[in-house]
């Protein structure tokens, strides 16, 4: 069986340490069980050409574009200005951190050479027998983008193949409207075996559909300390408190870490995924501390393994604290994933946001009990994925109905190509008022453009799928404009049928007028 894994993996904009590690952990788990598999190099829909190595350059270019178009998106401009400023300050550190992440991925992943996105998975065949979408927050409703079809295994190349979700999570951004809720359940109804990371998502799925969901461990917890120790780089620092926070400002986590470190005469090693030059520990504080941004995955694991204490608001900070059996405390975090993890292992007393006394009492952790629970949960998780992979699924679903129900903007344009320099009269573009159904039954309009020097020859068609443009070529295939190699384009006459396009995610179809000498 050929297995393709789709996950966030290397495309975390803030270079979150967990993203490459949980994908790596799942791949290694399958290999250990005898299942060959490949990580699909997949860019999420929200990626938008982001420059992973130099985000400063990305935001700088975005701002130029926004200002050129006289955009009134004031809040977006302010946000980009701040991010540009922040990433400029850590320009060198970011490059170092990025290179370390890439080295780990290049040395440890089995992955596709080619990079795919939601649009390319509509027209290219990957030829896997089974597709598994793997944690982390892959089922979120991304603001301004929506759900990512690839993370739901809803791409055309995956049709009628075995589909499994492992430890999927939805995060804090989720379906808000009836339409978004329908879209979510349309996606998961086509997944054969569903497992999720949080109990709340399991309840949501089972209460609103006929699908069953199993709660499983995050992939990093499928491996023990011995496994992860092989990828640890031991830090030179000793007797330190490791402070690791993500996403939020984490003021409570930072404040309590400072108090604890002073009380116990410990140096703080501060690490975050935020683009900060000097961290968030105030210089005026009386604590000894060291802030690090330019570290890699092995160093991050090392700081956890050899820490005297850990303060974090991170889900995976908690996971690796459990794996390495560390004394750790947890600050406030939005969402329920951290809460669920602590409840799973009866470690609610690690939270200090509701019980500050935990810091003065400094309770120990009974890792014998934690280990028993971990083994039980491992068995459930392993059984889920192995049983799912061993089931034979014969699928002959017709996906054309949903594809034909897509509506797209139909636009006619009049561009100057080749040697045409004539000034065309009247309109230069025309958008059909009503969106077109993708049925293959709509007719192309007669040419509505005029020229004094040339006569109309034919139409060519290109299609916007998600955010990528594709040509419709002579052999009735769709080719990405970026990959176009002068293949002959299909020539349409007026009143020809607009083809049915057997893809998802159609946003626009453009018919361009082509002219010839009079």
Regions found by a protein language model. Give the residues of each.
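Active-site anion-handling motifs in enzyme catalytic cores
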Residues: 1-404
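Secondary-structure capping and domain/repeat boundary segments
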Residues: 402-518
